[in-house]
Regions:
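Structural signature of tandem-repeat unit edges
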Residues: 1-27, 31-45, 55-70, 81-94
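Leucine-rich solenoid repeat scaffolds
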Residues: 70-134
Length: 134
C-alpha cells in the first residue's frame, strides 16, 4: 500500500493490508501502530465512515473520544464484522441512526446486555465501559 493513499484520506483498504512495503529497515514500531488514545476529537464534526469496511478490526478503544461536536456518524462502523470489543468513554455518544454497529448482542462489564440490529444499538451514550460481542 502506498503512503499517498493514506495521506489522501483513502485508507479504507488498510484493514486488508497483507504485505506492507518498505519495512526492512524499521527497528522501532512503538509509535507506528494505529492507536487512538491521543486523538483530540473535541472539534471533530464528521465521523461518517470513519472505520468503514475495517473487517479485520477486532478491538476499538474510543475511551478518549469526545463526540459532543459530531453531527455525522453515518456508517462509521459499517462492515466491521471482526470487531469483538468496543471501549467507550464518558464523552462518547453515538450520533444519528445509521452508525452501523455490527449486528450482535453486546455485554458490558456489569453483565448488562445490549442489542444491535446492524444499524443502531441500545448501547448507552456517555457511559464509560467495555462492551464485548456475545
Amino acid at each position: 500500500m502506498k503512503q499517498e493513499r493514506i495521506r489522501n484520506g483513502r485508507c479504507n483498504r488498510v484493514a486488508r493490508l497483507e504485505k506492507p512495503d518498505g519495512l526492512s529497515e524499521a527497528r522501532d514500531f512503538s509509535h507506528e501502530f494505529f492507536t487512538m488514545s491521543s486523538f483530540d476529537t473535541a472539534n471533530v464534526t464528521n465521523m461518517n465512515k470513519m472505520w468503514y469496511n475495517c473487517r479485520s478490526l477486532t478491538r476499538l478503544d474510543l475511551s478518549n473520544f469526545d463526540t459532543s461536536g459530531v453531527t455525522g456518524m453515518d456508517c462509521a462502523f459499517y462492515a466491521c464484522h471482526g470487531m469483538n470489543t468496543l471501549v467507550l468513554g464518558e464523552k462518547f455518544a453515538f450520533v444519528g441512526n445509521t452508525y452501523s454497529i455490527p449486528l450482535s448482542r453486546w455485554k458490558n462489564s456489569k453483565g448488562e446486555v445490549f442489542d444491535s440490529d446492524g444499524t443502531v444499538s441500545n448501547i448507552p451514550d456517555n457511559a464509560a465501559d467495555v462492551y464485548s460481542k456475545l
